[in-house]
Each structure stands twice: as C-alpha cells, then as structure tokens.
Amino acid sequence: DGKEYQAISAPAQINKTMNDSGKSFTIDAKITRGNGNLTYETTNEKIATVKDGKVTIVGRGKCNIVIKASETKEYKETEEKVTIKIDKGYQKIKVPVTSYKKYVSDKNFKLEAYVEAPGDGKVEFIANENDVVKVSKDGEVTILGPGTARVYAVATGTNNFNRDISDAIVITVEDKKSDPDIKNNVPSSNVVISFPSNAIQL
C-alpha cells in the first residue's frame, strides 16, 4: 500500500524503585515522523498501570509500556516499547528517642521505632554484646548492670524493600545515687579573725 511506518521517540528504559510506589510520571514520547495518535498500554498491571501516557508504579519487577501511533491515510500503525524496571526500595526507620540514661534499680522499659511509609518491613531490635542490658526483639529492655550499651532498630527485608538498620540507640546505666548523708551536709562555719587597728607592729 506504499504507506510508511511512523517514528516514535521514547526512552528505551525507565528505572524506578518501590519508594516511588503509588506515584505517577509521564513518559516523554512523541511522534517524530507521522501523524497518528499515541495510545499507551501496559503488559503487566501488577507492576505498572498507564493512562493517557501517565504511568503509576504498583509493584516490583519489569514490564513494558507499549506505545502505538494509530494508522492514518499516509502512515501505518507503528509500535514502540518502553521497559519499566522497578527495583526494591530502601526503608527509613524513625527512632523518636535515641539516648537513655537509667539507673541499675530502674524497671524494664520499651524502646520505640517505626518504619516510615512506603516501607513495609517489621521493626526488630538488636543489641551489641554487652552486660549492661538485655533487649528483646520487640524492644523491651531489662537492665543488667552499669555501663553503656548500643541498640539498633532493624527494618526487616521484604519482597519490595531492602533491610535497613538505624543509627545506634545509646543506653547509659549508672549505679543508683545514694541518699545524701545528712551529717556530711552541715555547712562549715566561716571563721573570721580580725585584728584591732592599733595592734603593735614589730
């Protein structure tokens, strides 16, 4: 029929991570030869959806966005593929309190941390080897003795996000202060010795 194919300009591949989950972006595609209308389709809606050229990230993996230039009187229908690659995202752990000062006689207490969206890992706590505190996975701290210990909050790795570890939570434990000894708290009297102004000088 003598018709030519059209030419579509578009990126070969677009890389994103799961931190972009739910976010949309536009593919920079245009017809450089031809006069058809562009339409867009995804090959896997579990990874990315597309509407009017706007792509929304759904899940991890790889799919294609198929861009078609419709047939016209002068040109054939033409197709171009853009690969969308979605990698695992990184997680961010929020730790409201990062240092504690305790005494040996204090009761157990609980550490706090959470994973910021869109991260979906579970938070667990781990401590460096020490004889100051014992820490359970869910963050309950039992005091063992005086000293300093470092504890870390860990966001577990998932299908969509990599494992992540927080900065150190520092726990300092001191021996309990003893009650002030009343006897030792008596203020010392200041003794003032004055000499008469007419004292004989040798």
What are these model-predicted stretches?
Residues 1-202:
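Solvent-exposed beta-strand/loop surfaces, strongest in extracytoplasmic domains of secreted
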